[in-house]
Amino acid sequence: MAIVVKPAVERGKIAPFKMGHVALKVRNLQEMIKWYGTVLEAEISYANDDVAFMAYDDEHHRIALVKLPELELPAENATGMDHCSFSYKDLG
């Protein structure tokens, strides 16, 4: 049985109406810029040697990439974000 969640605003609560952005720590900034540019059609709204802000809509940025090349890969059983998803109106 699926549970239908009534939006918080409809329940009289103050809640975001959409997610603003996500910031990701990356080891290879240029590789990630290329990946998000290709997969999400995101464009750079600001970048320097250590950070890039990218957007695919009218927001300043939806994805912030912060270069930290010294980071180690997390252990397989470490806590952290597993995934995020993006909705498309049409793939055609």
Q: Which residues fall in each region the model found?
A:
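Conserved active-site tyrosine of GNAT-family acetyltransferases
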Residues: M32-G37
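Generic structural signal for beta-strand residues in well-ordered domains
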Residues: G12-A15, Y56-D58
